[in-house]
Every structure is written in C-alpha cells, then in structure tokens.
Amino acid sequence: MNIFRLTGDLSHLAAIIILLLKIWKSRSCAGISGKSQLLFALVFTTRYLDLFTSFISLYNTSMKLIYIACSYATVYLIYMKFKATYDGNHDTFRVEFLIVPVGGLSFLVNHDFSPLEILWTFSIYLESVAILPQLFMISKTGEAETITTHYLFFLGLYRALYLVNWIWRYYFEGFFDLIAVVAGVVQTVLYCDFFYLYVTKVLKGKKLSLPA
C-alpha cells in the first residue's frame, strides 16, 4: 500500500468521524443531507459484498466494516435518533435521477457481467455523484456550518488522494482501472468549486455558501 492510498483512507475516515461527532455532540443533523448519507450507505453496501467471498487483509476487511457500520449509524442518527432536527424541506434532491442512470450504466459498462462485479461498478459510479444532494442542499440554504465544511473537505481530499494513488499505481505497478479513474475524476471535479470556497472563506474564518 502506498502513502497516497493510506492518507486517502485516513482522510475518508476523518470525514466520517467528523460528521458523526458533529451530529452526536450537537444532538442535531441540521444542514446534513440525509439523502447523501443514504446514497453513501448504499455505496458501501453494494461495494463490500465481497466481505462474504474473499479476504485480502485485516486492514482491508476492518476498513470495509468501519465504512459500512458508520454509514448506517449516520443514517440512523439522521432519520431516527435526531429526526426532529432533520431539514427535509431543503433536502429535496431527486436521488432517482442519480440511481437509475447509474444503475443502467453499471450494466452497460463494467469489467465482468457478474452480480458482484455489476454491484461493485454501481457503487463506484454512485459514489462519484452521491455528494450532489448535500451540495444541492447547501446551495438552497445559502450556507453551511463550519464543521460541515470540514467534513466535505476531508471527503473531497480522500478522493483527490485516491486519484494520485491511481497515478502512482499506474507508473509503479502497471495497474490501471479506467472505471474507477473516470468516476474519481468526476467526483473530484464536483468538489472543485467547494475547495475554492473552503480555502477563500472557511480557512479565513468566514461562513461558506454556494452559489444558488
């Protein structure tokens, strides 16, 4: 495992922990898109079904279990534990416009036409756009809490580091996964505007807002 993969995983884990702590400590999920979190839970569920069929390493298995457990814990906090604080009026992105095309694409473009491979491909495509409901929600409300922006920053950093990881693996291992790379580029591009606002506003102590 190279340093970019490791730091990418740690950034991803940091984002998840920041979000869970934000919700738990504030006893509120205000400003958090439940729809994005449901999509991420679906991403991890469909991606890590190989937990039942293969073992790569203790690290790999542990991270998969952590991602799945944390994603469902987040969904539970939003839709059950702190349901009264969930801002459903602004979390209105039509997720079917993401799931249906992604589902169709995963059947058409994949590495192998087998159930696990199609589901893995579906998860890769879906993850690339799963943050859209959250960004859409921020654009509707006009701003985001600082802690929420930190969550988004580490989530975007994770994907950017994974892009570097794939470049590293291509040059030093000869490994190249076109599906993962293209989806990763799409996901990183979606964060570009946010990264700019994060650096120019949040790091200077200002509130973040996205153009409506």
From Swiss-Prot:
Residues 1-4, 53-58, 111-116, 169-178 are lumenal. The keyword DNA repair does not apply. One of its GO terms (biological process) is maintenance of protein localization in endoplasmic reticulum. The record marks 5, 54, 117 as: Interaction with the K-D-E-L motif on target proteins. Pfam families: ER_lumen_recept (PF00810). It is found in: Endoplasmic reticulum membrane; Golgi apparatus membrane; Cytoplasmic vesicle, COPI-coated vesicle membrane. Binds the C-terminal sequence motif K-D-E-L in a hydrophilic cavity between the transmembrane domains. This triggers a conformation change that exposes a Lys-rich patch on the cytosolic surface of the protein. This patch mediates recycling from the Golgi to the endoplasmic reticulum, probably via COPI vesicles. This is ER lumen protein-retaining receptor 2. The lineage of its organism: Eukaryota, Metazoa, Chordata, Craniata, Vertebrata.
